[in-house]
Amino acid sequence: MSQLSSRARVELAKASLSRIGLESPELRPYQDEPAQMPSGTVGKDGYLRLEFADRGDRSVMAFMDRRVPFLVQRALYWDEAMPQMPCIFIITTTGCVLQGDRMALEIEVGKNAQAHVTTQSATKVHMMNANYASQLQDIVVEEGGYLEYMPDPLIPHRTSRFLSKTRLSVAETGSLLYAEVVLPGRKYHHEDEM
């Protein structure tokens, strides 16, 4: 597992999140800060790092570091076909993504470790009148590792701006099952119901 301190990881994630928005020409008109809370403040600047390790008879969540709004449910072992695999639910206390949100997620599956990671529900990206929201995902699967990362769908609402960057690093003998689903928002609702 990586040797960076938790604080260094958070700072690196923050810097990366700032850059991905600035590097996107589509988002240049939306660099203004929302009136409520500027991006980078508590609850707007989420960070989650999960590390999984092989412990012989089963894999475990060996390390977790988080910043609001992320929470993680304790590991469950409910997959009968793979009883040694921990199943983890990522929970967000805000329940949605708002303008100015910056989220970073890092998942590292160590040598011969296994994990199933998902979310508690669909991620709703709400309407925005300023700025944008962004997400950076770094996923690493080491030799012999196996990861199922299947978050529930992302639902962007009208006038939302959401930038997501995902970096995948899978060793030659590692396996990753990854899904990303985007659904339209309330297409058939009346204008006043949005």
Residue ranges and their predicted role:
Residues 1-132, 188-194:
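Terminal catalytic/cofactor-binding subdomain
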Residues 117-119, 148-151, 178-179:
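General beta-strand structural signal in soluble alpha/beta enzymes
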Residues 133, 140-142, 184, 193-194:
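A structural signal for the main folded, soluble domain(s) of proteins
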Residues 48, 103-105, 135-137, 145, ...:
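One face of beta-strands
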Residues 153-156, 161-163, 176, 180-194:
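Short acidic-hydrophobic catalytic motif
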Residues 110, 142, 169-171, 179:
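Feature marks extracellular polysaccharide-active and adherence modules
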Residues 146-148, 168-169, 175-176:
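Extracellular beta-strand scaffolds
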